[in-house]
């Protein structure tokens, strides 16, 4: 078949979809705002639930887009998408104009900016880091405190920027719990004598093998899970972090000293997605992600005929779900182009 499709976003969803669209014979322009494709996954070390190296998935995706039908544009952001006479006109911030018969938005998510939760001390106290910061340390093989010493007591705060009315994000980001479990296990593998604590609201392990990973973290690695909300983080004269928490299972307040505190940052609609929604009349939901036409039978379709969605631009998703969502988007696009506009 013939046709031109623009895919906006060069992460997991965009790369998977672009490769499949090209395989169908369509001409694909893949646009990524960063200078390098790969999205968030390229910044991660091991991924759950099997803890494989993320580069295995990246290589799979890169091989997918190594196709003559794909034109890759990096370091460019979309200004808007306009529909004229049945086709779409996409403009970029650099002034590039692209015409397409269909558009796939795969702009993904941004991590919650943890400095917005001032009570946790990110950007204020040494050794308060985010899950993304820790993943970068894993990749570099340099998990250490700011003074170069090994951490002996490490805490993880779940739901930072999720399930939080104060910051306006009442939804669950879905992946924070399992990411904390995975990272806690990796910490213990590097520092066997370390004491690791996870402070959680509820453990939401709703994916394949997630519950098994959670059980293993307790039985094999000795991770300590404390149910309750952290109210405040401070620092001692000796530069130890102090966490105050209400242990809701034990029914008593806790005060704990730590060497390192990891904030499990949740997901938000990406800034690039927000810009597109504002300039292209695309609807967003109460969670401020793109709102699909129908959550059950039209999760890839937008309110504009010919514009489709794939991946975490519509809601938090894991890698498996993102790839499946991208594949279903390709099916909808092919059907749309084949059966006329």
Per-range role (PLM):
Residues 1-341:
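Residues forming the flavin
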């Amino acid at each position: 078949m013939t046709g031109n499709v623009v895919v906006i976003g060069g992460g997991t969803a965009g790369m998977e979809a672009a490769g499949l669209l090209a395989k169908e014979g369509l001409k694909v322009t893949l646009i990524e705002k960063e200078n390098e494709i790969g999205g968030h996954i390229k910044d991660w070390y091991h991924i759950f639930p099997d803890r494989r190296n993320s580069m295995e998935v990246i290589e799979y995706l890169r091989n997918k887009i190594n196709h003559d039908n794909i034109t890759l544009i990096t370091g460019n952001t979309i200004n808007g998408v306009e529909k004229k006479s049945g086709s779409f006109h996409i403009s970029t911030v650099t002034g590039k104009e692209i015409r397409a018969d269909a558009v796939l938005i795969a702009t993904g998510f941004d991590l919650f900016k943890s400095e917005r939760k001032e009570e946790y001390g990110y950007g204020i106290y040494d050794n308060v880091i985010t899950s993304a910061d820790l993943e970068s340390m894993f990749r570099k093989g340099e998990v250490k405190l700011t003074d170069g010493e090994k951490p002996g007591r490490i805490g993880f705060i779940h739901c930072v920027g999720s399930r939080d009315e104060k910051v306006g994000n009442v939804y669950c980001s879905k992946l924070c719990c399992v990411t904390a479990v995975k990272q806690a296990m990796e910490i213990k593998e590097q520092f066997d004598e370390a004491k690791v604590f996870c402070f959680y609201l509820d453990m939401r392990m709703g994916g394949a093998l997630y519950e098994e990973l959670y059980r293993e973290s307790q039985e094999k690695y000795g991770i300590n899970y404390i149910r309750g909300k952290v109210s405040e983080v401070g620092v001692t004269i000796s530069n130890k972090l102090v966490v105050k928490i209400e242990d809701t299972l034990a029914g008593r307040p806790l005060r704990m000293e730590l060497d390192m505190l990891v904030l499990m940052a949740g997901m938000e609609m990406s800034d690039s997605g927000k810009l597109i929604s504002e300039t292209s009349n695309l609807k967003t939901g109460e969670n401020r992600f793109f709102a699909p036409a129908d959550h059950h039978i039209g999760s890839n379709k937008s309110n504009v005929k010919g514009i489709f969605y794939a991946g975490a631009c519509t809601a938090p998703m894991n890698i498996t779900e993102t790839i499946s969502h991208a594949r279903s988007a390709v099916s909808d696009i092919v059907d749309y182009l084949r059966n006329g506009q």
